[in-house]
């Protein structure tokens, strides 16, 4: 009531616009946005245009599984799991595929995330300029163990990478010399059922049967284990794999066993994979401690 209009009240000053102010608040933000646009375009092109020490890009097929990563080196004909080894200063062209649900491929210190979609090939292009180990992970919720779908990018000097590559291109020994490892190989190929999901080139796979993906996706269900002994993390980079903590000893009964089972991540995985990573595809085989020790001795020999 107090501020109601009264008869003969004076009219307030009327403002009908200020061309100068309107031009300023239009031009200044436009210039700012243009600067941001130019910087964004420059950065986007810079992300995929590298000055590489190696003129030939390294082409790798990256396959997202539940819940681990497969890395297939297309020109080198080798495959690894959970560890992507690359040379420093080389353009990497990663072809991204999924065998099940949507994943997302991301290494925060090297590149932004890119979705990995079933039935749709995607691409991530990057380059690592410093030697070191970089942690990667899935950033798209993909099921129960999404948080445990990790991997490492291991960047080596060109010479170290060439040495690693030469070793990876070799098939596994068909007959281990160590008797415990030999017993583990027989177990792998026999009653344990391991070979039903895993393959080892030179043992139960030919050189052209190493893929989990592509034209013959039925060859393997689990990770390729040809050079398992050279890796340092397993089960989607959830467990450490260190031979020093998985020492195989012979007991008074003449049977092998693991010296310290609690410290051995691979022992825990083989004993009860569902306790380590519930919902994963690896079934419990009810292996005895002796059988686990034999399998560990064999897997360790696969360097």
Which residues does each predicted region cover?
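Short, solvent-exposed mixed-charge patches
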Residues: 302-303
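Non-transmembrane, membrane-proximal soluble domains of secreted or membrane proteins
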Residues: 1-193, 199-220, 233-272, 276-278, ...
């Amino acid at each position: 009531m107090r501020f109601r209009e009264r008869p003969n009240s004076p009219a307030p000053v009327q403002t009908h616009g200020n061309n100068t102010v309107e031009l300023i608040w239009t031009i200044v933000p436009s210039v700012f946005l243009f600067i941001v646009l130019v910087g964004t375009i420059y950065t986007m092109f810079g992300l995929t245009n590298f000055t590489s020490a190696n003129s030939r890009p390294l082409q790798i097929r990256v396959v997202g599984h539940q819940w681990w990563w497969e890395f297939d080196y297309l020109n080198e004909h080798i495959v690894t799991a959970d560890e992507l080894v690359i040379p420093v200063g080389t353009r990497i062209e990663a072809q991204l595929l999924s065998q099940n649900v949507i994943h997302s491929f991301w290494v925060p210190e090297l590149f932004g995330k890119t979705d990995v979609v079933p039935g749709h090939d995607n691409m991530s292009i990057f380059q690592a300029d410093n030697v070191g180990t970089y942690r990667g992970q899935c950033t798209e919720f993909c099921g129960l163990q999404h948080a445990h779908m990790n991997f490492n990018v291991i960047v080596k000097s060109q010479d170290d990478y060439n040495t690693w590559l030469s070793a990876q291109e070799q098939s596994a020994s068909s007959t281990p010399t160590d008797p415990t490892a030999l017993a583990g190989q027989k177990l792998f190929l026999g009653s344990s059922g391991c070979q039903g999901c895993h393959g080892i080139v030179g043992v139960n796979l030919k050189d052209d049967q190493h893929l989990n993906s592509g034209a013959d996706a039925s060859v393997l269900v689990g990770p390729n284990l040809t050079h398992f002994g050279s890796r340092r993390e397993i089960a989607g980079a959830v467990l450490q794999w260190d031979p020093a903590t998985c020492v195989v000893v012979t007991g008074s009964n003449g049977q092998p066993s693991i010296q310290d089972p609690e410290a051995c991540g691979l022992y825990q995985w083989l004993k009860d994979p569902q306790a380590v990573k519930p919902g994963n595809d690896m079934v419990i085989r009810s292996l005895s401690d002796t059988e686990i020790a034999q399998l560990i001795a064999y897997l360790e020999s696969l360097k």
